Each structure stands twice: as C-alpha cells, then as structure tokens.
A protein has these predicted regions:
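Charged (often Lys/Glu-rich) extended helix/loop segments that serve as interaction or gating elements
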Residues: 1-108
Length: 108
C-alpha cells in the first residue's frame, strides 16, 4: 500500500471529483498505484503522471512475467520532458541468455 502521487497532465488545477483505480500492467492483484483515488475527470488521450513508480522504475524493477522495463522520462520544473532511459527491447531481455549446445535438441 505505498502512496504514489498522480496527476493528470493539463488538469493539475482541476477539481478532483472522480474516483479511479490506477493499476499497473502485470497480472497480479497487488499491482496497483492507487485505489479509490480522487482525480480530475480523465478522458481518452489524457496523460497521467505517476511521480514515483516504485517497482515499475529501473531502480526496483525486474522482468517479472517477462515484462520489459519502460522508458524513464524526467519532467523538469519548466515543464520540459527529457528521456533519461530508453525502454528495454527483446534483445535486451535475452542478451544474457546462454543455452548450452545440447539442451535444445528436438525430441525423437
């Protein structure tokens, strides 16, 4: 139950009169950023900023369920955004895999 600060881009000063659950992408019942959180009305196409992503960020992240780590962006005080870590690729995920030669023989 860690608290994650969440804002809706462009609606920072809007009245928080809607209740949402904000969840992660894993198939786990505890992959939640917020439950019953009051936020401004969120429309399709709105961007949500989760200011502190915990285990979804690189520092605590891992490839659970084969999930690739997301890109990380830095939101500067002047409102500009900068990519500080690119998203992982499948090549990254399998880069350390080293299967011994005879292990992958087809069954007769």
């Amino acid at each position: 139950g860690a608290y994650h600060h969440i804002t809706v881009v462009g609606k920072e000063d809007a009245f928080c009169d809607h209740i949402y659950d904000v969840t992660g992408s894993l198939c786990e019942n505890n992959d939640k950023f917020a439950i019953d959180r009051k936020l401004p009305k969120i429309d399709i196409g709105d961007r949500i900023v989760i200011h502190d992503t915990g285990a979804h960020g690189h520092a605590m992240g891992f490839n659970y369920n084969g999930k690739l780590r997301s890109a990380e962006l830095l939101l500067r005080e002047d409102g500009s955004v900068e990519l500080i870590r690119r998203a992982e690729t499948l090549d990254d995920y399998f880069a350390t895999l080293d299967i011994p030669g005879g292990l992958m023989k087809p069954h007769a």
